[in-house]
Curated annotation (Swiss-Prot):
Region of interest called Disordered, as start-end residue ranges on this chain: 1-27
Gene that this polypeptide is encoded by: lptD
Similarity comment text for this entry: Belongs to the LptD family.
InterPro entries xref list: LipoPS_assembly_LptD, LptD, LptD_C
Name of the protein in its database record: LPS-assembly protein LptD
Record note on quaternary structure: Component of the lipopolysaccharide transport and assembly complex. Interacts with LptE and LptA.
Amino acid sequence: MDLSSLPDPLRPTHSRLPARRRDRAEPPRFEQRALARLAAWMVCGLPLAALAQTDPGPGATAEPAPALRSSPLLQEKIPEDARPKLPIFVRGDHVSGQPDINATVEGNAELRRGDTIIHADRLDYAVPDDLAKARGNVRINRAGNVYEGSVLELQVDAFSGFFDDASYRFLANGAYGDARRVDFIDRDRALVHEATYTTCQKNDESTWKPAWIVRARSIKIDNAEQVGTAEGGVLEFQGVPILPVPGSFTFPLSDKRKTGLLPPTVGIDSVSGVVYSQPYYWNIAPNRDATITPMVMSKRGVSTSGEFRYLEPTYSGELRGDYMPSDRLRNRDRWALGLKHRGVFDTGIGGIGLNVDATRVSDDNYWRDFSTRTNGGISQLTQRLLPADATLFWGANDMSLSLRTLKWQTLQDVNARIVPPYDRMPQIHWGYMPSSLPGGFDGSVEADYTDFRADRALTGQPNARRSYAMAQFSRPFLAPAGFITPRLQFHATQYDFDSALPSTGRRTASRVLPTFSLDSGLVFERDARYFGRNFLQTLEPRAFYTYTPFRDQSMIPVYDTAANDFNFATIYTENGYSGSDRIADNNLLTLGVTTRLLDPEDGGEAARFGIAQRLRFSDQKVVMPGEAPVSERLSDVLVGAGINWTRQWGFDSTVQYNPKTSRSIRSTIGARYNPSDYRVINAAYRFQRGTSEQIDVGWQWPINDLWGDKGQNLGPGRGQGGGRWYSVGRLNYSLQDRKLVDTVIGFEYDSCCWIGRVVLERLQSSVTTATTRLLFQIEFVGFSRLSLGSDPIQTLKQNIPRYQYLREPVPPPSRFTNYD
């Protein structure tokens, strides 16, 4: 704002003389009038520029008076091109000045320009230099960041200058500190000398000290990148220096991503010895980043892990890799590569896309030797079947076409060898599903060609090229009270083998089969009231009949087919097998009934109970190799229940019951109690007769609840206040073997500005071996983490359903939340 347009009453009698300070008790008459006018304009909220609206001289063009414009929102960030046009507001107990030269404000002085506010006992502002000098109780609020001190010199628009004996507090993370001097470089950068930095909030006790604090020779603050860089710094915890850094290190000022070293991890492993890893994060672009993690293992050598991620409007993915030269454990180089890619492009004649999921490792023992790797690279690699799966697809309206290649790497164990699945080199699939057909009919056609390849010495059967086609037509009859859907399917399959079948001596086989099904159901509704609550109760009986004639398929090898799991999702289907190598001969009727309790306000399901059973009218002769034909007329009974009576409680159960033996074959019972944030208990019982019987319990719960301390609700991802202990864990116990299979148990302590975690993890890796780790971490909130072993947060998230991190990333607060 230009102060040259002060109104005439504020002009001194002799313009060449500076304005003199006078006693406020006896101001001259012209100053009384001027201050009265100035006070009136200040009360009305007008900038000093408005004081210049005097009559224009002869020939001059009158400038329009400034006016306020309505806006639907406050601007979080002021545009750069608008800053030079921003007016300056000043007020205080005593204001004097010279036009085009300066202004002086004494007593409760305040200067405002855009998102910058300066308070002081005395403030001098020089117009030509845009320079503000302030003394006594000086306070700057710059976009929510607050600086306080004794002496300030600042170029207001450029925001460059210095502040002596200063303290500061940042809006984004609540961090604050003290400094001998603050040099403001520009609006986003500052250099703080002999500085401290912490996020521990002060209390009223005179003996209070921050739990952790950084002391540094200097700290460079970059609010644009939200990064702090400390030179000659040391991290103190509970008054003890724990991490001196003679050089420089960076730390975040918010949750924004930044390039730099991530917290290191130190661990001890019985196989690898002492393990030290130091991740480096590279923020390449807003939609691309990379993490490189060198790792030193005292018993094995040095390895490097890397991860690259990318995100575009039409595609995304990640590339991971590990490399360890001359691993002393196996006396060879070890490596792993992984790629995941997903993408779809609009071509104008449909969308074309590519999906890739590929993983490869150097040797069969990789899954065993690197099963606990979590810092970069291939994470949690414990599976022994690794895919290299790529699918190129196209789709438009009712039609789709895809080309897929799938090749497996099987990691064999000499003590437990497995038969690898078949590669698909390639698989071509075409599908057509018209959105509407005349007469209310529905229909679809699909065709598939797959070349199955594998090592015949391991599979014991020939490879094959399989061509498959299926057409289906249905006519749904729908009404509010029920539905009837007849459906007719035609299956045609042709096999070409690379060698003669042992059973027939032929190199080809074919199969053509029809399938008919009739699905029907009714829906009855009534108002009901249970336990003081109103519900809409439904009763939904369902009958499903299917018929497929018998065709001998015993000579056809199995390439991609398996028996479906027996549950409520598969009991109402035409074929009991997934894949296309077996189509079961069926003449059966499935009967079931479900009742639901629905909330009449929002339609939410409070409870669900169901039962279903199959009635077989003839034996099922088509089976998988090693299976016996099915001759029982009545199948096992499926009984299921799900209860979500409130948002806090949940219960789900499915039981497969054999009425002939009066015993359950398989049971799954689960319950959840989640009364509020950071309080959850999950329990499950799983039973499969003759195979396994396990109890699984997982939890996260504040221990302070035991003595009546319920904590505070600080919002999502903010914890429940300081001084709180949390118990976390998961126990998987085998009743059949009478031992714990998997164990994760630990504690978390939240002290507001730091969080401590200690977790014991024991995971079964085979029948006879298990991996045990002790994980320890201190998180300095808003600064960094120090870990011993792998990151316990990832372990807790992977093992405890509904586990909540005590400090989730949250959007930065608005600058108007700290507005003066």
